Amino acid sequence: MKKLLNEWRKFINESGFNRIKNILQGKVASVSTVGFMTAENPMAQQLSRKENKALNKELMAFMRERGYGPIRIRGRFGNKERSFMIPNITRDDIVEAGKKFSQESVIFGEKTGDNEFVFQYIEGDKTIQRRDVALFDDEVQAREDFFSQERQSAGRKFYIPF
């Protein structure tokens, strides 16, 4: 029974990661844009876990009020971080949220064709860099910093190379 439960958890986790991967590769017809952000550690000032949790709860409410369904993810960008992937968010809304929660940057992606996204690294409301790839390969899986991963996953990572 324990083996069956472990296999089921693995299946569920993989399906979550595969959903994220398919979105970032432009393979989900119902998703035309995506945003990434956290409310943690405003302007790179380290806060307590309790303070960060409260800020992310506020960000979740902000997104839901606007009709978005944020997906909880986690990662490491210098420090461990709990963040969100927000399907179908507008550029204006991700920029507004970044400013509201005093974030140095946010990421916005837009589908530009079949199976293709272009991602923007945005500071304030200015696009600083663009990339047309999200990485998932073995090199990404070995990263110890600067990656994101599906929250329930046992280590399946992804990375947009800004």
Show which residues each predicted segment covers.
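N-terminal, charge-rich interaction modules
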Residues: 12-62, 152, 157-162
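A recognition module on extended beta-rich or small alphabeta surfaces enriched in W/G with H and D/E
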Residues: 121-162
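Short, intrinsically disordered low-complexity segments
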Residues: 64-95, 100
